[in-house]
């Protein structure tokens, strides 16, 4: 026999706020130095040429240019920036 009623509505209904992760500037799009390219947990995408990672693994553009996503032989995704011609 149950010793508690099966209601419990006040103990339910909690969920964490979404963290808005993901790619913010896609391949072929222009990025300005300092722009966020990818927000991520861990290193799903790794920094390539002219891209640096913040302490929370967010990838930022180091220079103005076009974003490029590539996969190398190790099957990992790399994000790089091809600078605009001066």
Swiss-Prot record:
SUPFAM superfamilies given in the database record: Ribosomal L27 protein-like
Keyword Ribosomal protein: yes
PROSITE patterns in the cross-refs: RIBOSOMAL_L27
InterPro entries: Ribosomal_bL27 (IPR001684), Ribosomal_bL27_CS (IPR018261)
One Gene Ontology biological process: translation
Protein's UniProt keywords contain Ribosomal protein: yes
The family this protein is said to belong to: Belongs to the bacterial ribosomal protein bL27 family.
Name of the protein in its database record: Large ribosomal subunit protein bL27
Annotated gene: rpmA
């Amino acid at each position: 026999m149950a010793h508690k009623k099966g209601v419990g509505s006040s103990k339910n209904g909690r969920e964490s706020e979404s963290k808005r992760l993901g790619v913010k500037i896609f391949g072929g799009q222009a990025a300005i130095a300092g722009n966020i390219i990818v927000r991520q947990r861990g290193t799903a995408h790794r920094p390539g040429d002219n891209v640096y990672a913040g302490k929370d693994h967010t990838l930022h553009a180091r220079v103005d240019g076009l974003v490029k996503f590539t996969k190398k032989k190790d099957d990992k995704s790399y994000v790089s920036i091809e600078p605009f011609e001066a």
